[in-house]
């Protein structure tokens, strides 16, 4: 179910404030955030945002195609290591 149009998209207030300040000053520093549920706005295009995955911050460079999506969509929280091949069951006699 999508978010109500009446409410509008969610973005963390502190994150939006930092983005607007950097746009005014012309800075391009990496911004750390824990807000994975924030929607990507057009003002964020061209910035690098380090999104927390539960362990560390993963840098995400925001492009035009990402507008409207959430920050957490671009950072995986689980790492799949693969299934271990069992030597005994794979050999047939």
UniProtKB/Swiss-Prot annotation:
GO terms for molecular function: rRNA binding; structural constituent of ribosome. Pfam families: Ribosomal_S19. One of its GO terms (biological process) is ribosomal small subunit assembly. SUPFAM superfamilies: Ribosomal protein S19. One of its GO terms (cellular component) is small ribosomal subunit. Keywords: Ribonucleoprotein, Ribosomal protein, RNA-binding, rRNA-binding. Belongs to the universal ribosomal protein uS19 family. Protein S19 forms a complex with S13 that binds strongly to the 16S ribosomal RNA. This is Small ribosomal subunit protein uS19.
């Amino acid at each position: 179910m999508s978010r109500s149009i009446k409410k509008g998209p969610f973005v963390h207030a502190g994150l939006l404030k930092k983005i607007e300040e950097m746009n005014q000053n012309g800075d391009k520093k990496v911004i750390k955030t824990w807000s994975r549920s924030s929607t990507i706005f057009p003002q964020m295009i061209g910035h690098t945002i380090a999104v927390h995955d539960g362990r560390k911050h993963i840098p995400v460079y925001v492009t035009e195609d990402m507008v409207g999506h959430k920050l957490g969509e671009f950072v995986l929280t689980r790492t799949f290591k693969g299934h271990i091949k069992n030597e005994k069951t794979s050999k047939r006699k």
